[in-house]
């Protein structure tokens, strides 16, 4: 019997830099769903990839001294490495620089133009370069980009526009008649009330202000913008062809069963993408799910805040499956989730090392100790066994129900409910006492069998979320019974075989103090490495500058000032000022907040990680409503350019300058 196809897609990652753990959450979430669908017997195709065109990339490549293609090759490679590190089972990793994709995008653009859905005009408004988006004055927030909060510029350019307005009513009708199309419900309401019902404006779909994009083949002054380029990857990745010569993959898997994207870009994927598909006379994805954000503490991750956490660092500290568990377990269905170092350590020690790891280790060790590792089931049952079996048999239906609604965290909780019940069963049956009674050996074997079978069933279900750990547990039990669809049966663990002689420690406990010392040491080492790798400026003999001398002071006056080395661990722009930055500066074992008028010369991102010279005994002052507890020293040239004064050699934060 042929398997039913299931196509799941994610947003494609923008190749502007290395993805943090918040970006990584989406691919792990999609992977858990794809793995689960395979376990249910579906023929799954899972696609992800990278979005590689745009002005931001053109600028970053120029700053790096490489071509845009060289730049995206490097970043796309980094992204793919992290996706692979996280053990994601994608079937297709598409790049928007792929030749087939680029050719099909040109054909899609031309088709839409030829049928009158794309027309040429002029776009004028407030433009945000990082977001590559135009905004009207009313859309700005405090005069800045409503999406990223950065400064915007006035811009006008010739552009092609896509007639969103032509299809608005049709899309509204579709959403109303397909209640599962946009999920969760809150995202659907947001799209309807904030965008569709007030009326859609036509969409700018080309650019002339940069060249790094797919050329419009009939007007090469223009490049195709992201709304046509990136959004079409979900069909071009299947071999869709505008001329009707689509690959069998497209015919088999389209429309997508699940399109998984972040809540911040849901407008593009529930309005722009569906209308493009309607204009191409193609079916829409069956469901678009806008997942919430994974935060660090109470806020989004940002380099300027110094709170960015990368997946590969977490893997180094905890291991792949532990990181998968953190991000999947801590994400609610429709609200933002949050991780902290303290929470990750708690989950590691309580859930993974104790509830799961210790249970597996104890059970296998007892079977080795009491029965030489041989698995047997004499069937000497008692009433206490019934509840364990009931919890085990109920698990798969509960997991199915949660996964059907994409409540992945809740599904994992159902598996851990069984693991907790197994731990309780040990306390109830006390195998170590049974072992001392020669007349209770068959009962002891039955108890251990029930435990191992409960563990086996939990491990089979965990394969979608912790694939390596699942396989290790099943291997240690020596079982080939790994079929999720058979979890409605208790007692499939084969008898007569043997468990592993020395069970592996699945998850080692972590000491929070030792971990944070390692994290801080790694941060310092990375900052030092980046500083050492920075290209040195060629030494030049320059003409000196003269300044107006100030009144002389005594040595005693000078000695009143205290200078120390400080390390900037976080930095952000002061909202009420265009000149000020607010830095969190580590000095010794304390952190001070210092406001500096250097915003025109350094971005917040550039400041983080720098060692600077600080006057530390100035009386605190308030600048633009923000308290400042010191002064960061800079030098100023004749043109007013500022440069931070930094130690020539590596010095610890807090070192006295004398």
Whereabouts are the PLM-identified features?
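Phosphate-backbone binding interfaces of nucleic-acid-interacting proteins
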Residues: 533-658
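N-terminal catalytic cores of NTP/NDP-binding nucleotidyl/phosphoryl-transfer enzymes
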Residues: 2-75, 94-110, 114, 131, ...
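Structured secondary-structure scaffolds
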Residues: 2-48, 100-104, 148, 154-369, ...
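Intrinsic disorder at enzyme termini
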Residues: 473-557
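Helix-rich, typically C-terminal accessory recognition domains appended to large enzymatic cores
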Residues: 120, 343-380, 391-499, 615
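A glycine-rich helix N-cap at a beta->alpha junction
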Residues: 76-91
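Cys/His-rich short segments
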Residues: 115-168, 172
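Secondary-structure transition/capping motifs at alpha-helix termini
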Residues: 1-2, 36-43, 64-68, 85, ...
């Amino acid at each position: 019997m042929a398997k039913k196809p299931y196509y799941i897609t994610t947003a494609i990652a923008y190749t502007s830099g290395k993805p943090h753990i918040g970006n990584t959450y989406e691919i792990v979430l999609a992977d858990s769903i794809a793995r689960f669908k395979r376990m249910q017997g579906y023929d799954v195709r899972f696609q992800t990839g990278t979005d590689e065109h745009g002005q931001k990339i053109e600028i970053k490549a120029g700053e790096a001294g490489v071509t845009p293609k060289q730049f995206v090759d490097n970043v796309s490679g980094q992204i793919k490495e992290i996706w692979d590190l996280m053990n994601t089972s994608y079937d297709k990793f598409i790049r928007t620089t792929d030749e087939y994709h680029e050719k099909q995008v040109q054909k899609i653009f031309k088709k839409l133009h030829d049928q009158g859905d794309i027309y040429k005009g002029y776009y004028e408004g407030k433009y945000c370069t990082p977001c590559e988006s135009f905004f009207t004055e009313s859309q700005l927030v405090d005069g800045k980009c409503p999406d990223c909060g950065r400064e915007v510029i006035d811009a006008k350019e010739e552009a092609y526009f896509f007639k969103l307005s032509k299809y608005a009513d049709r899309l509204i009708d579709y959403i109303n008649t397909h209640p599962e199309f946009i999920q969760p419900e809150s995202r659907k309401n947001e799209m309807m009330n904030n965008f569709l019902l007030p009326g859609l404006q036509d969409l700018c779909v080309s650019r002339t202000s940069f060249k790094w994009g797919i050329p419009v083949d009939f007007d090469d002054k223009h490049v195709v913008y992201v709304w046509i380029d990136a959004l079409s990857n979900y069909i071009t990745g299947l071999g869709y062809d505008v001329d009707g010569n689509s690959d069998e993959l497209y015919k088999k898997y389209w429309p997508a069963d699940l399109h998984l994207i972040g809540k911040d870009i849901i407008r593009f994927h529930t309005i722009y993408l569906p209308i493009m598909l309607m204009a191409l006379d193609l079916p829409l994805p069956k469901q678009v799910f806008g997942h919430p954000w994974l935060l660090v503490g109470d806020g989004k991750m940002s380099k300027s805040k110094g709170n960015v956490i990368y997946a590969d660092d977490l893997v180094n500290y905890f291991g792949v499956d532990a990181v998968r568990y953190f991000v999947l377990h801590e994400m609610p269905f429709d609200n933002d989730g949050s991780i902290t170092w303290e929470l990750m350590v708690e989950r590691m020690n309580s859930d993974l090392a104790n509830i799961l790891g210790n249970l597996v280790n104890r059970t296998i060790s007892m079977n080795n100790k009491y029965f030489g590792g041989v698995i047997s089931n004499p069937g000497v049952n008692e009433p206490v066994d019934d509840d364990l079996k009931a919890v085990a048999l109920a698990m798969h239906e509960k997991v199915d129900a949660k996964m059907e609604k994409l409540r992945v965290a809740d599904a994992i909780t159902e598996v851990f409910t069984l693991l907790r019940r197994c731990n309780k069963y040990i306390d109830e049956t006390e195998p170590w006492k049974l072992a001392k009674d020669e007349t209770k050996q068959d009962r002891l074997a039955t108890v251990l069998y029930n435990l191992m079978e409960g563990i086996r069933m939990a491990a089979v279900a965990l394969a979608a979320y912790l694939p390596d750990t699942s396989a290790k547990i099943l291997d240690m039990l020596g079982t080939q019974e790994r079929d999720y669809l058979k979890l409605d049966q208790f007692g499939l663990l084969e008898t007569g075989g043997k468990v592993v002689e020395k069970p592996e420690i699945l998850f080692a406990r972590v000491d929070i103090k030792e971990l944070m010392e390692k994290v801080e040491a790694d941060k310092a080492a990375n900052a030092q490495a980046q500083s050492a790798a920075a290209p040195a400026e060629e030494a030049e003999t320059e003409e000196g500058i003269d300044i107006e001398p100030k009144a002389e002071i005594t040595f005693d006056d000078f000695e009143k000032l205290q200078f120390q080395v400080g390390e900037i661990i976080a930095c952000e722009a002061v909202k009420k000022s265009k000149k000020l930055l607010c830095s969190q500066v580590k000095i010794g074992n304390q952190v001070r907040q210092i406001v500096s008028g250097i915003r025109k010369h350094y971005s917040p991102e550039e400041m983080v990680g720098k060692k600077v010279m600080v006057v530390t005994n100035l009386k605190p002052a308030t600048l633009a409503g923000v308290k400042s507890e010191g002064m960061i020293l800079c030098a100023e040239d004749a043109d007013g350019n500022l440069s931070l004064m930094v130690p020539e050699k590596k010095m610890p934060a807090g070192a006295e300058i004398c």
